[in-house]
Amino acid sequence: MISYSRDPKEEIPASAVKILGLGGAGSNMLERIALDSIDGAQLISLNTDIRTLSASLSKSKIQLGLNLTKGLGTGGDPELGQQAILEAEAEVRAALKDQKIIFLCVGLGGGTGSGAAPILARIAREEGAFVIVFATMPFLFEGSRRREQAETALNQLAVLSNALVTFDNNRMGELVLAKQGIHEAFGAADKMISESIKAVIRLVVKPGLIHVGLDELITALRTTRSRCLFGSGIADGKDRAAKALRNALSSPLLDQGALLKDAQSVLVHLSGGESLTLFEIELLMQNLQKHVPEHTQILFGAAIDASMGDDLSITLISSLPEEALAS
C-alpha cells in the first residue's frame, strides 16, 4: 500500500535543525558535512579535547568537561565522558532549545562518544527535538573493550533516540576500491553519512510536490529499540530512475537491500529537477515494490528542486526491531 499527502503541512525552517558532531569521530563527520555545505542547518562541535575542538570548521563549539579533563581527552573512559557532558549540561541545553530536528554524529567505542552520546540524545529529546543518531562502530582490531563500550552505548541510544542509523567500520571496504587507502575509506564513510543527513533535510525541510512531513518520518521509524535502515541514491542520464534506485539499494546501511525484506513500512522520497516525469516515478516505485514484502506500507513523497538539474535522487528510510537485525 502506498500512502501520500499533498496537504500543505507546517514547514520546518532550516534554522530549527542542528547537526552535532560529538568526539573525535563525530568531528570528522562534521567536517565532511561542513564541506558539503548543507544550507541553513547549524553545525555544533562538542568535545573534551580542546585541540580537536579548535580545529573544527563548525562555527559553534562546546567544550565538554572544562574543569574535569582540562582540555584533554577522556582516555577511552566512558564514565569521564558522562561526567564531562553533565558538567556542560546547561550550555548544551541552551544550544538545543526550540530545535525541531537534531542530528547527532558520533563514533562509538571511545570515552567521549560512548559516554556522552546517550546523555546528549536524552537532553535533546527532553528539549523537544526529534533526534536522529548516526553512529559508527569500531573495527574489530581495536579490541574487545572498545567494542563492548560501543555496544553498551548503542543499546542506550536505541532507546533514547527517535532514529538510530549505524555503520560498522568493518564494512568500510565495501565503500572503496581494494587498492585505495584508509584515508579514502574514512572519507567515503563520512561522505555517505553527510549524504544521508542532506537527504533527510531535503525530505522534511523543503516543501514538496507530494509532501513528506515529520509525522510520516516518525511513522516509518516508530518501532522502539530499533535500528534505522537508510539508503540514498542519485543518478542522471538515460534510465536515471533505475540507476538511482540501484544506488540506494546498494548502500551498506541497507545490506545491499536485503534488510528491506523484513520492513513493515518504508518511507520513500524522490527529488528531481523540472524534467522529473510521472512515468519515471511510476517505474521507480514498481521496481521498489519488488524489494519489499507485499504487506509493507510505503509512505511516498516527491519534490521538484530546480537546482538538481538533470539529477534524480531517491531516499529510502525504514526501521527494524533489533531482534530482526540479529537474526
Residue ranges and their predicted role:
Residues 1-327:
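Tubulin/FtsZ superfamily GTPase core signature
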